[in-house]
Amino acid sequence: MIYFDNSATTLPLKEVVDSFMTVSTKYFGNPSSLHGLGATAEQLLNQARKQVADLLQVQEQEIFFTSGGTEGNNLAIKGTALAFKSRGKHIVISAIEHASVKETCEQLKTLGFDITEVPVDSSGRVSVEEVMKAIRQ
């Protein structure tokens, strides 16, 4: 799984803003709706999915769009943890993870996962040595 996050402080390219404005003002239908606006929005969404899949050389059904970082983090972490739980139920995170990461890991604890939180230095960096100590075989 590849997860993209355009940080909340990243200035988007002008072309991205222009595209967003066009889609937001002309193709604002719910892509799950049966009406014409919805059908048009669904076509546009499917076109975007195909473009991303082609770029990444993956299947279209492997591309998921989420409403934001929290939903994306939740999907990526739970999806990966549950898909690979037969390989182990131990997750290593840093002490400065986003709340959505920490909360998702707390939920996974209720499903029997162990969560290890590694510290960061004064610059907010994670030490490779700390990660290596936290990893279980």
Task: Describe each PLM feature range.
Residues 1-137:
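Pyridoxal 5′-phosphate
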